[in-house]
From Swiss-Prot:
It comes from Bacillus subtilis (strain 168). GO terms for cellular component: cytoplasm. Induction: Expressed on rich and minimal solid media likely in early stationary phase; dependent on DegSU. Not expressed in liquid LB, but only under conditions that promote biofilm formation. The lineage of its organism: Bacteria, Bacillati, Bacillota, Bacilli, Bacillales. Immunity component of one of 6 LXG toxin-immunity modules in this strain. They promote kin selection, mediate competition in biofilms, and drive spatial segregation of different strains, indicating that LXG toxins may help avoid warfare between strains in biofilms. Mediates intercellular competition during biofilm formation; disruption of the operon disadvantages the bacteria, but overexpression of the cognate immunity protein restores growth in competition with wild-type. In situ neutralizes the toxic effect of cognate toxin YqcG. This is Immunity protein YqcF.
Length: 192
């Protein structure tokens, strides 16, 4: 199946937000049944950081509708370029939606998607948050058959997961912001 017009618009929108020179890599699930394209741009939004976005995830349902129109997502992230696992982490998040029908919204946590690739870091899970790094540029896209928005994949630790489970994801987001965590550092220490 070729690239749809909608996905071309999505790719242009993401590239407009990220800037720089894009690279697109196709990732396959373990059974080679499903694939997802991951766009990456090195040294964006700053030197030593790579920005990522899924392309085509919005072709799959997250089980949400707004006024009768399916709401779909693409996942964005930014991580130290030295980390070579983050595209894999994003593809695993995408396959959770594509193959396992996970739902996804702000505050939702996908467990153990980092620890699958790196057991040495405190960061184990992904919490989805609004894409605050690019909020000016990644606005809702309205198509005839779907609306597309973006969620940012934010690494969290086991302790931070427990805080979210006890007090809610908004509480955890406020805590992470108050501690001024380095969102680009997958090896950062847990705040709890």
């Amino acid at each position: 199946m070729g690239v749809t017009q909608e996905n071309k618009v999505i790719a242009r929108t993401v590239l407009g937000a990220f800037g720089g020179k894009p690279k697109v890599t196709k990732y396959w699930d373990d059974n080679k049944n499903s694939s997802i394209d991951i766009l990456s741009v090195s040294d964006q939004p700053q030197e030593g950081i790579t920005s990522y976005s899924t392309l085509g995830l919005s072709d799959h349902s997250i089980n949400y509708e707004v006024n009768g129109t399916p709401l779909r997502i693409e996942i964005v992230a930014a991580m130290e370029s030295a980390s070579d696992i983050y595209a894999n982490v994003l593809s695993t998040c995408a396959f959770n939606i594509i193959n396992s029908n996970f739902t996804c919204a702000p505050g939702v946590i996908f467990k153990n998607v980092i620890s699958m690739y790196d057991q040495e870091t405190d960061m184990k899970h992904i919490m989805f948050v609004p894409p605050f790094l690019w909020e000016e540029d990644l606005e809702l896209l309205e198509f005839s058959n779907k609306n597309v928005t973006w969620l940012m994949a934010l690494p969290i630790s086991e302790g931070e997961l427990q805080v979210a489970e006890k007090h809610g994801s908004d509480y955890l987001q406020d805590l992470l912001e108050s501690k001024q965590i380095d969102i680009f550092d997958i090896k950062r220490e847990s705040v709890v």
